[in-house]
Amino acid sequence: MKYFVSGHRDLSYDDFRKYYVPVILDIIRSDRNPIFVVGDCKGVDKYAMDFIYTSLSQMHGYMESPYYLVIFHMFDSPRNTPNGLPEEELEKKGVLFAGGFKSDEERDASMTNVSNYDIAFVKDNRWDSGTAQNIKRRHGI
């Protein structure tokens, strides 16, 4: 299954650990072939890519899929990469990149389209945020 991780740029790492880490770990334990899709922004995107990469980079050779993490970015290159590593090194370890999007909305809609499930937390009831729009898009709201 493919999981779209989205969240606020200003979420604290403590809140990421509280709301996202348990869900991601449950998926890693229960899905033998998880594929996570994330954006390349700071905040939840960066926390998620680092956590997922650190958790799965040693296991990807045992998984059915040759990749487990896809980072979607605008333009030619991502703003952030897992643990700040170069794209070439990451691609050898199960991380793919999908770029060239012209807007956040185009990129996020593509992530919704290629995934089956959202991992998202709306902070402070901010239902006009990009994170909330991702959830609404999934459910046709």
Residues of each region from the PLM?
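Short, hydrophobic/glycine-enriched beta-strand segments
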Residues: 1-9
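Acidic/glycine-enriched connector segments
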Residues: 9-141
